[in-house]
C-alpha cells in the first residue's frame, strides 16, 4: 500500500494512477500498484482543498511457505485525516486481525499521497 518500502517508479514496482477532479483541485486518485513479485495492491486517495482527508489501501502479498505452496497476507488500511495530516481514526487489519498503525506506515502513506498529488497536478495543466 502507498508504495510501501518499494521503489514504486522503478523496475521493482510501478503504479497506474487515475485522477478525478473538477477545476481546480484533484478530489480523488485511484492507484493500482504492480510489483515484480507476487503481490496485488490498490490505494484510493480522497482530497479536500489539496489535503488528503481519507485513504483506503489494500494489499495481497504471496510468500513462499516451505514446500506447501504460497502463503497469503492481506493488509487493509483505512485512514480518516484532518486537513493538517492528523489522524482522526484508522483501521489496520492484517489477515483478519486488528493491528496498530506505525508512525513509519503513516509517514509513507502521507508522503506518497503528497508526491502523487504533485505529479498528477503537474500533468493536468
For the regions a language model picked out, list residue spans one by one.
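Short hydrophobic/aromatic-rich beta-strand segments that constitute the beta-sheet cores
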Residues: 27-31, 52-58, 87-92
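Mature extracytoplasmic domains of secretory-pathway proteins
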Residues: 21-23, 35-65
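Generic alpha-helical secondary structure signal
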Residues: 10, 18, 24-25, 49-51, ...
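Long terminal segments
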Residues: 1-11, 65-125
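N-terminal secretory signal peptides
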Residues: 1-36
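Short, surface-exposed coil-to-beta transition loops
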Residues: 13-16, 28, 38-43, 57, ...
Amino acid at each position: 500500500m502507498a508504495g510501501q518500502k518499494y521503489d514504486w517508479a522503478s523496475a521493482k514496482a510501478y503504479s497506474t494512477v487515475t485522477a478525478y477532479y473538477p477545476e481546480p483541485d484533484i478530489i480523488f486518485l485511484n492507484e493500482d500498484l504492480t510489483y515484480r513479485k507476487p503481490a496485488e495492491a490498490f490505494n484510493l486517495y480522497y482530497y479536500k482543498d489539496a489535503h488528503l482527508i481519507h485513504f483506503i489501501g489494500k494489499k495481497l502479498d504471496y510468500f513462499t511457505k516451505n514446500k506447501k505452496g504460497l502463503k497469503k497476507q492481506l493488509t487493509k488500511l483505512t485512514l480518516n485525516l484532518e486537513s493538517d495530516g492528523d489522524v482522526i481514526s484508522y483501521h489496520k487489519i492484517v489477515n483478519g486481525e486488528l493491528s496498530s498503525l506505525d508512525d513509519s506506515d503513516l509517514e509513507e502513506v502521507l508522503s506518497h499521497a503528497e508526491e502523487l498529488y504533485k505529479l498528477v497536478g503537474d500533468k493536468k495543466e
